[in-house]
């Protein structure tokens, strides 16, 4: 691998396919370089983890309820036994609506994506095709060097 990479093939593939599966060295560092190149190209990057996401469609494109940890406190008779529900705006839709005017789009970088099912990965592929300003990069595992492939090809291999 070259000492200095421009990241142009990575950005070109991301714009072409909309969703990429990434395999990065486990010691880290490489993904930050590619995220910096995405920001320099004009994309906004949002980092989330795949663990605990729940329903992807509700989390990314619909208003969804979450329950904060109760920390041992109970409100007898006022709320449910498991605590109150707070409603949160959709993450991807809200970010897309508030993009700067000169931004190319939003890249959602999802770490620990190996926990996602193939149906959830297929949903992300379809969502990136429906909304052209929305792109996804999923970290699928470790490798000795930084490599990527279209997410649709990684679904076929799985």
Curated annotation (Swiss-Prot):
It is found in: Cellular thylakoid membrane. It is a peripheral membrane protein. InterPro entries: NAD(P)H-quinone_OxRdtase_su_N. One of its GO terms (molecular function) is oxidoreductase activity, acting on NAD(P)H, quinone or similar compound as acceptor. GO terms for cellular component: plasma membrane-derived thylakoid membrane. Transmembrane segments: none annotated. Its EC number is 7.1.1.-. Keywords: Membrane, NAD, NADP, Plastoquinone, Quinone, Thylakoid, Translocase, Transport. It catalyses: a plastoquinone + NADH + (n+1) H(+)(in) = a plastoquinol + NAD(+) + n H(+)(out); a plastoquinone + NADPH + (n+1) H(+)(in) = a plastoquinol + NADP(+) + n H(+)(out). It is an enzyme of class 7 (translocase). The keyword Translocase applies. The keyword NADP applies. NDH-1 shuttles electrons from an unknown electron donor, via FMN and iron-sulfur (Fe-S) centers, to quinones in the respiratory and/or the photosynthetic chain. The immediate electron acceptor for the enzyme in this species is believed to be plastoquinone. Couples the redox reaction to proton translocation, and thus conserves the redox energy in a proton gradient. Cyanobacterial NDH-1 also plays a role in inorganic carbon-concentration. HAMAP family: NDH1_NDH1N. PANTHER family: NAD(P)H-QUINONE OXIDOREDUCTASE SUBUNIT N, CHLOROPLASTIC. Belongs to the complex I NdhN subunit family. NDH-1 can be composed of about 15 different subunits; different subcomplexes with different compositions have been identified which probably have different functions. This is NAD(P)H-quinone oxidoreductase subunit N. The gene is ndhN.
